[in-house]
């Protein structure tokens, strides 16, 4: 057995460029690799002008909305982390999305039409939508806030809360409230268990910004561009499909006589799991790229609408190949007792494995904060691991 201390290298790529996660308890903002004290003002200079790889349209969007773009960049970072979690047992495990010190979309695999390319695009689009909508609900962005609610709905909620307050004081329902007009919904009674209220996450704004920021790269008549746009749409659709209802109790002495509820973005782990399931049933498109951008054969739109699509057969990803975005599997930790994809037999592609004693320092107990830093503890781990030759 070999003994080799292998400290974990510092994060690179998007992690290093945007939000280098802290390996100590010290607080720091790192936007695009800039070390800034506290919570700096998010200006075009701190967000846009130091980030390479933006298209002309993206740069313009960033200059107009630097705070929203900062949230979008955090969404990309979270999406890469989730991608790595979902594919942690695969030969291609999303680590290539971190390299290059630029946006993930400059990774070689995102210029191809593999299954893994489709999954990555959907994850990144979902991450941007999710992060922007969440920042809206927290009141962090100038150009958006809570999801829209009609004045009638607000009036119903106000009447309900006033009625509950009056009842808690032993009084009758206040007569000063305006009575509903013809055709209006009746005033809510105290027996009603919940009403829509609170701050809905503005998913429409998050979806639109994700579309404007990511789909702007695409040429509309190119088959690869159409594949990317389609998979971007699927990623955003999964976020919408998994919206959650969150509620807050109202009542005396901690009771829950009445609840106000709002629609909130799902946990991003649930989004990642749903997209991982779609990866397993992704649809192969046999296409003749005649610059028409049409999928051949023409499948029913309903069948395609919620599924990932790809048009290139994936390589085995055993060896390093920068042209395909494959880092290879040499040096990857494997499970020698597993017969699944994470087993040494599969992951090491028949090359065998070594047993090493590794000591590394890694980030742990990380918490994402808006915007744009990650606060982590520092953990030292020593263990025997099986590593692919």
Curated annotation (Swiss-Prot):
UniProt-annotated location(s): Secreted, Extracellular space, Extracellular matrix; Secreted
Modified residues (Phosphothreonine): 46
GO terms classed as biological process: bone trabecula formation; canonical Wnt signaling pathway; cell fate commitment; cellular response to cAMP; cellular response to parathyroid hormone stimulus; cellular response to retinoic acid; chondrocyte differentiation; epithelial cell differentiation
Alphabetical list of InterPro entries matching this protein: Wnt, Wnt10, Wnt_C, Wnt_CS
Location of region: Disordered: 171-197
Annotated signal peptide: 1-28
Tissue expression summary: Detected in most adult tissues. Highest levels were found in heart and skeletal muscle. Low levels are found in brain.
Source superkingdom: Eukaryota
Disorder this protein is connected to according to its UniProt record: Split-hand/foot malformation 6: A limb malformation involving the central rays of the autopod and presenting with syndactyly, median clefts of the hands and feet, and aplasia and/or hypoplasia of the phalanges, metacarpals, and metatarsals. Some patients have been found to have intellectual disability, ectodermal and craniofacial findings, and orofacial clefting. Tooth agenesis, selective, 8: A form of selective tooth agenesis, a common anomaly characterized by the congenital absence of one or more teeth. Selective tooth agenesis without associated systemic disorders has sometimes been divided into 2 types: oligodontia, defined as agenesis of 6 or more permanent teeth, and hypodontia, defined as agenesis of less than 6 teeth. The number in both cases does not include absence of third molars (wisdom teeth). STHAG8 inheritance is autosomal dominant.
Protein name: Protein Wnt-10b
Organism the protein comes from: Homo sapiens
